Amino acid sequence: MPTPPRVLLLLAKKRPADLEARIAAGEEPEVEYLALARRLGAEIVDFHSVEASSSRAVRWAARRLGLAWGLALLGAQRRREFAHLYATGEDVGIPLVMLLRALRWHERLTVVIHNADTPKRRRLLRALGHRAYHAVICLSAAQERVLVDTVGLPAAKVKRMRLWMDHRFYRPSRAAGENEAAGDYVLSIGMESRDYPTLQAAAAELPYRFHVVASGWSPTAGFTAAGGIQGGANITVERNLPYARLRELYDGCRLVVVPVKRVSYAAGVTGICEAMAMGKPVVASASPGILDYVEDGVSGRLVPVGDAGAMRGAIAALWDDPDGARAMGRHNRVWVEAEINTDAYVEQVARLLGSA
C-alpha cells in the first residue's frame, strides 16, 4: 500500500485535551478527524493552535476576524510543509480558499462543505472558483446539486460521501432479534434545524411516552438548547447528556423521531444514523438534506415537513407493527456496518487524497 500523503488537517474548534483518553475508555464515540489523522499521518491544528501561534498575523486575524480566520491563515502559512490541506468545514474552508487563491496555491485543498445553500455562501463560493480545490466533500445529494448546478463547481471535484459515525460505540446492547421493538418510549434527539413544535403537536394526541434530548451534539459544544419543545404529561425533555446516557436512551427506545425543517443540508442526519446504528427504525421529516439516508418503508417512515398529523400516524404505525419495526431496525444496523461509519469515510478520504 502506498504511503499516504502528509496532510495538515484544520479543525475549526478546540479539541479537548483528554478526548483520546475518553474515547479509549469507551466514554465517547470515535471522531472522524482523529481517525483521519491516524490513517493519513496528518497533523491537526485547531483553535488551540491559533491561540498558541507565534505568528503575530495569525493572532491578529483571530482577534479581529475570528478564530476560523486565524486558523485559515495558520494553514496558509504552513502550506509548503504538506502535500495536502484538509479542512473539516466551510467555516475555515472558505477563508482558506480566499488565502490560497491569492497565493496561487492550487489543487491541493480538500474541504468538507456541510451547507453551501445560503445567499452569502453561494455568492462567495461562485466568486472564488474551483482552482484551489483538490476536492469538495458534501454529505447529501441536495448539497451536491447546489455546489455543481448553482455554485458552478466542476462535478468531478465535488465528492458526495456518507456521514461518518462510530458504529462500534453505537451498537445494540442486546441480540438483534431482542432489541429493535423492545422499548417502551419514543426518542427524539438533536438541535440543528429541528421542528419540535410539530413533534409536540403529534405527541399530544398519542398515548406513548416521549423522551426528547433537545440540545447540540456534545455536552461540551456550548450550543444553546433547542426551543419549541416543552415537557408535558407524556413528554420528558433532557439536555446536554453524556454520550453514554444518550446511547442508553437509544438502546431503550422503540423508535426514533427526527423532526426537521425544510433545509437542503443534512440537518438531523447524525441522530438518524446513530439511531440506525442502534438498530432502531426512524420517523423523519422529508427534508431534502436527509433523503439520502432514510428510505421510506425500508429504514423508517418519511413524513411531510411540518405535518403533525402525518408524523402522528407514522409513529403509531411503527409502534403498532413490532415485526415491521424489527425488520427496519435490522436493515438499518446492517447498512450502518456496511456504509455509514467512520471507517468507511476515512478510507474514502484516504483514497481521494492518495490521488492528489
What role is predicted for each listed range?
Residues 214, 222-248:
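Nucleotide-activated donor-binding/catalytic signature segment of Leloir-type glycosyltransferases, i.e.
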